[in-house]
């Protein structure tokens, strides 16, 4: 061991430049591996740290959205789910939560005064608490079934400074309350340990009891229902049972409602419904897999993208592979210089096994030094911008599992990279070894070329993928949504303005005085969003499910939505029936015509051009824009081009302060920024992939640099002879570049199909995507050729300009 350690130190001293290049490359690779794997580990472990997550399932019906079996709802009718739990001995526990993760005002008492705070409160049942095995930090979690009681997460209780028995006041309406209501006092009866941060339950800061809410509404889908199954239970069988139970519940409810429907719609219309297939499909989706479940229509439970996560994992492994190839090339580059030393040891009786162990120890030494340096670099990255692109902490102590995995990968890599070179260099017959030169042998050249080719293939694949990431991001930003989103500012209205239409009108009148503001409108929720309210109605014998956006009557005008027929008028927002605008594709699909009345209370007021109101990961759905003067939560303002935006925003804040002086000024943003937020996660991960793909290319070029260094050293005599025979510097440079240009072209031919396959798989996760253009592949080839020629030229230039006499003398 001592001799092996001394040999390792000797290698570091004797080959400083090559050793430094390899340590630098491995350090960068292991740093990239750690950072990427922290993110990948977080995503692959999403929801899995919840106790028995593999046996907890979401009840996800399909009938409300479509009956194709390709799309499932996160919400379900509570009566059918509760009856499923009652009839299924295979279910250990089950219960609903109303997963509306909205921040609402909450007040606590401090020195006799109400102190306003913010809190995310959801309604849930004791069955839900039992299903998730929530643990009590204080109090009794089952006590919240009593009226006016609530449970708090431990972190929120500490932040608010309250404990069991203390009082918290909640708003009666989370969207409209601005003042504390003394009669809305809740007693804290239990404090539970926070749910895991990498889970869909992490946002639950407080819970109140759902009681019997929804138990008499079998056609209302408001509740997210989870069940925990016993070991060995078939979830598909439970899903089929739910469909049967739901059909019974719906049939009983329809029989009860039939007289009212006949009175409202007529006997003939109601009789036509009897032929409908009301059997609603269902899937039980495991909680541990929800993060990547694209069949689930949800804006909360499935934020992950499996192709993106797998792409991250692939980049992490490929970066390490490229660095290890550099190491192997480095080892073989030293073979000619070290062969004589090895054979001297063998002549003097050194065991071959001992020599091989020494070389393996050397490989492990390089890897471990690089690994330790990478951990230092990773720790330093915690305070950099890169940390903001990772969903969790980069601290080493917070990611011990990743450290263990990386250490195992590093040691396995050291063994894999060192075992063949160690065997090879000790395999020569001592009497024959001095006669040949591995540096100039055909086998040596072939091996080095193959290793470099692998690096090039990987690098080209990563560059192509990075270019397509950028192209998809650019495509999303420029996608035509069907309205003019440029020059539009937006903000969340303060509570008084959101709650009182007259306050909104007062704000609009003040803003109208600014000639730079061309129009003001509002909606009840963000117009472009992954969350929707969905209405299901009967129309001409067909079940019509539409996504609803409640908007002010002038919304199409301000947003410059092209109207093909009809339109909204100011009085439409206050009529006794709703007035709706539908896009052309929706009108054609359901045969809507202006002036028709849907379900006796929705009048089709007009038809617009097609609109994209959801992120591009999702296919568009049928849309109705319904006029409502009470839709004042999200305000939109169209600004004249060339306006001083900061000055306009200051004027908006002053106007808000005049109307609602008790609330702080809102955050005013461009609508494009709000839309970009919908792609924030994908964009963050794309940036990480691009950064480390670039790093992989840099490491590969370091390998090329080292290989050219090796070749120029061992071809000095050839270069000298060529120069004596009249070769110019440019011709010498062309000789070196020609080989690497050919290698690049051959590698591109291999990499292009692999890159095409990977890009197609990744883009399949988007409903709207860029085409796989050959120009991007050619751009990647041009980029690789450019940096290769630059690298080879830079390194071989000194050899090409050297004095031939010096080379001949040294030989």
Model-derived features with residue positions:
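Membrane-helix entry/capping segments
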Residues: 1-5, 10, 14, 18, ...
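Membrane-proximal extracellular/periplasmic loop immediately following the first transmembrane helix
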Residues: 36-107, 115, 213-214, 221-226, ...
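Mid-to-C-terminal secondary-structure elements
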Residues: 125-137, 152-304, 506-681
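Small-residue-rich transmembrane alpha-helices
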Residues: 283, 363-430, 461, 471, ...
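Hydrophobic alpha-helical bundles that form the membrane domains of multi-pass transporters
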Residues: 297-387, 401
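Hydrophobic alpha-helical transmembrane segments of multi-pass inner-membrane transport and secretion
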Residues: 14-41, 304-340, 368, 447-472, ...
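Alpha-helical transmembrane segments
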Residues: 21, 28-62, 381-390, 458-487, ...
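Intracellular coupling helices
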Residues: 5-17, 21, 25, 323-366, ...
